[in-house]
Each structure stands twice: as C-alpha cells, then as structure tokens.
C-alpha cells in the first residue's frame, strides 16, 4: 500500500473487488495515517490565528477546505 500525502490517496496492490468484498467496500473505517491527522490539526490551528495588527477576535471563516 502506498500513500501520497500531496494527493490524499491510498493505493493498494490488491485487485478490487476481491472475493471477500463481492463488489462492496470493506466494512469498517479506512486507515488514516498520523501525518494526515497532524496536517489537518496544523491547518486548523493556523487558520484560527488572527493576522498581525488585526483587532479582530473571532477566527476567520475558511471556505476552501473540503473534507470528504
């Protein structure tokens, strides 16, 4: 299995679907590497910082982050 951090894609060498799956996705959650969790937390923390010289106390709203 290969992980591409810049694309957020998991690639597996196993054929899909296999006999156990019978055309369905496997039960349970897919593995999420720690790098993705750490990056997501870092982006969230950075997004909540206010710009220097700003008196604004609320966090800015981010509309370009899409989670799926």
UniProtKB/Swiss-Prot annotation:
InterPro entries per record: Neuronal_3.1
Superkingdom to which the source organism belongs: Eukaryota
The keyword Phosphoprotein is annotated on this UniProt entry: yes
Biased composition (Polar residues): 44-54
Subcellular location: Cytoplasm
Residue segments, region Disordered: 21-54
Posttranslational modification: Phosphorylated on Ser-59. Phosphorylation decreases stability and activity.
Keyword Ribonucleoprotein found: no
One cellular component term from this protein's GO annotations in UniProt: cytoplasm
GO biological-process terms attached to the record: axon regeneration; regulation of neuron differentiation; regulation of transforming growth factor beta receptor signaling pathway
One matching Pfam family: Alveol-reg_P311
Subunit organization: Interacts with the latency-associated peptides (LAP) of TGFB1 and TGFB2; the interaction results in a decrease in TGFB autoinduction. Interacts with FLNA.
Function: May have roles in neural function and cellular differentiation. Ectopic expression promotes axonal regeneration, induces differentiation of fibroblast into myofibroblast, induces myofibroblast ameboid migration, augments motility of gliomas, and increases retinoic-acid regulation of lipid-droplet biogenesis. Down-regulates the expression of TGFB1 and TGFB2 but not of TGFB3. May play a role in the regulation of alveolar generation.
Protein name: Neuronal regeneration-related protein
Gene that encodes the chain: NREP
